[in-house]
Structures are given as structure tokens and as C-alpha cells.
UniProtKB/Swiss-Prot annotation:
PANTHER family: PORPHOBILINOGEN DEAMINASE. It catalyses: 4 porphobilinogen + H2O = hydroxymethylbilane + 4 NH4(+). GO terms for biological process: protoporphyrinogen IX biosynthetic process. Signal peptide: none annotated. Its cofactor is dipyrromethane. The modification S-(dipyrrolylmethanemethyl)cysteine is found at C239. This is Porphobilinogen deaminase. Tetrapolymerization of the monopyrrole PBG into the hydroxymethylbilane pre-uroporphyrinogen in several discrete steps. It comes from the Bacteria. The lineage of its organism: Bacteria, Pseudomonadati, Pseudomonadota, Alphaproteobacteria, Rickettsiales. Its EC number is 2.5.1.61. Keywords: Porphyrin biosynthesis, Transferase. Pfam families: Porphobil_deam (PF01379), Porphobil_deamC (PF03900). The porphobilinogen subunits are added to the dipyrromethane group.
Amino acid sequence: MIIRVGSRASRLALIQAQAVVQKINDLLGLNAIIIPIKTTGDLIQNKNLYDIGGKGLFLKEIEYALLNNTIDIAVHSLKDVPAYLPDGLQLAAVLERGNVGDMLVSKIANKITDLPLGARVGTSSVRRRIQLLRLRPDLNIVLFRGNVDTRWNKIFNNEVDATVLAAAGLQRLNYDTSRFCNIISQDEMLPAIGQGVIAIEARKDDKLIMPLCAKINHQLTWQLIQVERGYLKTLNADCNVPIGGLANYIGNNNFEAKFMLGDYNMRYFFYSEVCGKLQHGYDIGVEAAKNFQKKLFV
């Protein structure tokens, strides 16, 4: 049996797909092949994601292939997976979470607070934008699309003074993060929902593939992302809504989580911390979102 693994065609996406293939080989003793698929999100690089349909554009063509049975599973960065999936598809497994943090990449500063007045910071993420401007309202936020390699090169071509990139992506691409890269404190910038997690999507009714996915699923990571995705689904937020969140395991079946919700125009910013038992994680994430909604509609 050969399992067909659908993936975006970017270098990072293919590395992540290969990590899934390796798990399939090592844990299941099965062969798998990667089928690269160009997505709309990859092809349109000169516009903000929220102007052209959101992060779901990185999944659309891959999910179409999944629904049409030309691939058996799809591999995504979980942070790109919307709150709700197409009918007939579901998240089937996740690998163990990588580095969850964001990194400031800059030749001239080690911290956001060290950037010069009016510094140009490249990002297309509204989550990063609002958190940067909360710390430094003087910053000049510049639209910054492209894959990790493209954005990295823009720094060293002096197109901007700094950018913010996911640490997990840089590490998976084997970038030397010992120079020009510094982790941003979670007190300054909460990550995206699901950041650092490689996710596997499959057909709900696939009685062969779903049990196989369960065998490579990292259970603790799965439980923690239920907290985060409960929050995401309740808000039903897309990429034009600045939201972030992270659940961490603290032992004895307990977790703690931090959430933020902002407004693109900086009219409000909500932050909360919650904790509880893993088995109640999804419901606690839902409740955190509802508490923010109550504040919005007071």
C-alpha cells in the first residue's frame, strides 16, 4: 500500500510533508509519496491574505484533491487551517509540536523595543501587526508576503529593518538562528492558534486512512490544540481578525492557556489566561472566546 500525501509545493511545506512520510514509514511500516500541489495562496503574493480570501487559500486546492481521492491525506501547518473544514474532511492527526514562538529577524535590533523610531517591519499577519503596534505605535508596518526564504532575503536586501517569522519554520528549514534572530517573549507576542504544529487532514469516511492517522497522532499536542481550536471555532475568526493563543501542559493532566483578540484599527485589545484539565480543554477554549464576545457587545 502506498499512501499519497498532498502538500503545498514550498520548501517548508515539503519538509513538513516529509516529516509525516517518515512517521508513516517508521511507525506503520508503510510507503508514502508526496504529491506537491500549487495553491492559490502561493500564487498570489502581492496582496494581503485578508483581501483575497484568507489563509484557507493555502488549503483549497489540496482539499479539492483530497475530496476527489487523488491524495489520501493532506499535510498543513495547523496555523493555516481555518476554524471549519469542508464537509467530508476533518483533522485526523498532528505531529508533536515544534517551537511555538515568533522570532524577530533583524540586522539592527535584538528586541522590538530596540528598533529605531519609525523602523520598517515587514509582515502580512494582522496578529503580528497589532501586537507590534501595541508595543511600538511608531513602527511602520510594511506588507510582507512570500515564503520564508523570500522574507528572509528581503531583510538582507535592506527592504525592511525587521520582520517576524515563526521559529518552527526557520528551524525546520535549518536556518542559522544564532545570528539576527531572537525569540519574542509571549508577553509581547502570542503565537497564532496551532503555531508550530504539523497537521494531517483526511476524509471522515475513509475507514482505512483514519485509523492509520490515529497511530501517528501525538496525543498531548492533540489535546492542547483542542483548547486553542475551541477558542478559534467559537470566534469563527479568519485572517483579518487579530487573534492568538497558546495552551501549555503544566503537568498532572493540567494545562494553562493565554488568548488575545484585537481589532485591526486598534480600537480594542483583549487578553486572558485560563487553566484547567485537559479533558475539559475544548470547552474552556470556547468559554474564553465567549467571554471576549461579551466584552465586545456590552
